[in-house]
Amino acid sequence: MEIGATKAVQDRLKTTKIEESKGASLVFCWDTHLTKIKGRNVLFIVNASNRYTIAMTDIEPRNWNYYTMYIRSVIHGVMQEMGYSEEQIGQYFKMSGDTTVTKTHGRKSVGGINRMVMDAQYFGKKLEKEAKYQWELSEYLNRDICQPEGFDAYGYPNELFKLDMERLGIATKRKPAKVCLLYTSPSPRDGLLS
């Protein structure tokens, strides 16, 4: 797993040596960015393939010291919230390999982060005081239709994350949705009535 760090995160980590991305599959790459939203430090953790976004606040100093472990535990917790089993989560992390901090994963990924930061400025509610995981903000950001790097079509990040899990074989493929056509009676304007 690669955890991309923007300049703001690199400064907070107090590191000068960050590796280039080694070309891991984007579904195993998460880019991170630290910014202020409504007067609080918010860490965005954004999947490079599907733009699924996790918003965290009040990062404790020890979490910065063990950054890769912290990010993995956050992703693990959010996947649990989404309904994935321990076996499925374990499979994801096993497939992702060793965790390293790298530079971000391209212009499109950074553009996605910038979009999330801009959208977060318009979030109409206050951030939860006692919660580190800002669930409502994350849900708000994951309802923004987009076409991220890992997909040819537009979609919502939360749906695209599920599709990535299906592509990896971690989640079972859902049946295609049935389309119901609404039948209306012919109208004289249709020219079908004589």
Model-derived segments and their meaning:
Residues M1-E20, E86-L182:
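Globin-like tetrapyrrole-binding proteins
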Residues Y67-G90:
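Short, solvent-exposed cationic patches
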